[in-house]
Structures are given as C-alpha cells and as structure tokens.
C-alpha cells in the first residue's frame, strides 16, 4: 500500500515538473486535422493589448471642452468624442449630477416590528399555558382514595 502511494506521488511530481517546465513538448494534432489548423510560430513575440485600449485615445485639443465633468476620449470606430465621467456624474457629456439620497427610518417600521414581536411572544405563552394546563389535568389520579368509611 505504501509503495503504491510512493509511486503515485513520484508520478504526480514528474507530471507537474514537466507541465511547469518551459521545455515541455508540444504534440501537434493528427495528420487528418493538420490541414484545418494554422500555427503561429511567433507566439513569444506577440503581445495582445487590452480591447479597451484599441478603441479610444485622448481627445484632440478642439474637443477638450466637450466633457463638462469628465475626461474626453476619442473613439476611433464611432469616430466621435466620448466622455468618461467623474464619480457622481452621468450623461453623454457628464452633465447630470447624481444626487445621493438618504432615507430616514420612520417610527412606523419600529412600531410594526414591536407589535409583531409582542404577538409572537403572546402566542408562545398561550401555547405554553395550554400545554401546562393539559399536563396538570392528566396528572390527577383516576382512582378514588377511600378512607375506611362505608364499603362499596
């Protein structure tokens, strides 16, 4: 048993070492599938930029005042200036201020919670009272204790 575990650990270690090494062998697809595959031999020289950087660049000087509350960027595919709004602003030109609103908790909510908890406790106490009362009635002995008086 211990020998099997030792062999399994050694095989796992060798597999991990081969997978992590840069000299791992790449096996090409079978000859039947090779005609449909194309290989890129310059994978190490190719660096792909993020997609977001390909589409927009900073605006020209004539568009600098286009965005009211944000940074201007020029989208090459749309061929127009777009705005990246600062926090709290929205709109095509960042012209709308998003107001943060705060709701004040009303006392009605707390009153409703208090009434609900009170009803729940009352129901629990009523069930407990009924259970204790039924138990006390069942504890009474069904036999009558006679004290040596008259015979039956």
UniProtKB/Swiss-Prot annotation:
Keywords (A to Z) from UniProt: Disulfide bond, EGF-like domain, Glycoprotein, Growth factor, Membrane, Signal, Transmembrane, Transmembrane helix
Glycan-bearing residues: 36, 40
Ranges annotated as spanning the membrane: 110-130
Tissue specificity: Expressed at low levels in testis, heart and liver.
InterPro entries in alphabetical order: EGF-like_dom (IPR000742)
BP GO terms, sorted: angiogenesis; cell surface receptor signaling pathway; epidermal growth factor receptor signaling pathway; MAPK cascade; positive regulation of epithelial cell proliferation; positive regulation of MAPK cascade; positive regulation of mitotic nuclear division
Location (main, coarse): membrane
Extracellular side of membrane: 19-109
Keyword NAD: no
Cytoplasmic topological domain: 131-152
One GO cellular component, as annotated: plasma membrane
Subcellular location: Membrane
EGF-like domain residues: 55-95
Signal peptide: 1-18
Disulfide bonds: 59-72, 67-83, 85-94
GO molecular function, one term: receptor ligand activity
Membrane topology term: Single-pass type I membrane protein
PANTHER family the record matches: EPIGEN (PTHR10740:SF10), TRANSFORMING GROWTH FACTOR ALPHA (PTHR10740)
Function of the protein: Promotes the growth of epithelial cells. May stimulate the phosphorylation of EGFR and mitogen-activated protein kinases.
Record-given protein name: Epigen
Organism the protein comes from: Mus musculus
Gene designation: Epgn
């Amino acid at each position: 048993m211990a020998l099997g575990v030792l062999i399994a650990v050694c095989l796992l270690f060798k597999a991990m070492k081969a997978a992590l090494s840069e000299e791992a062998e790449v096996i090409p697809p079978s000859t039947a599938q090779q005609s449909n595959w194309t290989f890129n031999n310059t994978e190490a020289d190719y660096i792909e930029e993020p997609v977001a950087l390909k589409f927009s660049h900073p605006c020209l000087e004539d568009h600098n005042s286009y965005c009211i509350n944000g940074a201007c960027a020029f989208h090459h595919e749309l061929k127009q200036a777009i705005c990246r709004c600062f926090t709290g602003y929205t709109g095509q030109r960042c012209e709308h201020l998003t107001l943060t609103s705060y709701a004040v908790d009303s006392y009605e909510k707390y009153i409703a919670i208090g009434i609900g908890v009170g009803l729940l406790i009352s129901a629990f106490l009523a069930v407990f009272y009924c259970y204790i009362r039924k138990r006390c009635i069942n504890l009474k002995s069904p036999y009558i204790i006679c004290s040596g008086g008259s015979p039956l």
